[in-house]
Amino acid sequence: RPLTQHKPHTPGDEHPHGAEPPGXDTALAQIXGD
């Protein structure tokens, strides 16, 4: 799955939502399809 542009994806962490800022969380949800 795509990584966040400003922050690398933590291995084993499939749900970074909540740790990300609301804007990035929304973008990640759309890109990732979560």
From Swiss-Prot:
Give the originating organism.
Answer: Gallus gallus (Chicken)
Q: Which domain of life is it from?
A: Eukaryota
Which compartments is it annotated to reside in? Answer: Secreted
Q: In UniProt terms, what function does this protein have?
A: Binds heme and transports it to the liver for breakdown and iron recovery, after which the free hemopexin returns to the circulation.
Keyword annotations for this protein, in alphabetical order, are: Heme, Iron, Metal-binding, Repeat, Secreted, Transport
The GO cellular component terms are: extracellular region
Q: Is Plastid found in the keyword set?
A: no
Please list the coiled coil stretches: none
List, in alphabetical order, the Gene Ontology terms for molecular function in this entry.
metal ion binding
Q: From the Swiss-Prot or TrEMBL record, give the protein name.
A: Hemopexin
Q: What is its main location?
A: secreted
Bilayer-crossing regions: none
Q: What is the lineage of its organism?
A: Eukaryota, Metazoa, Chordata, Craniata, Vertebrata
Q: Which family does it belong to?
A: Belongs to the hemopexin family.
Region annotation (Disordered) maps to 1-25
Q: In which tissues is it expressed?
A: Expressed by the liver and secreted in plasma.
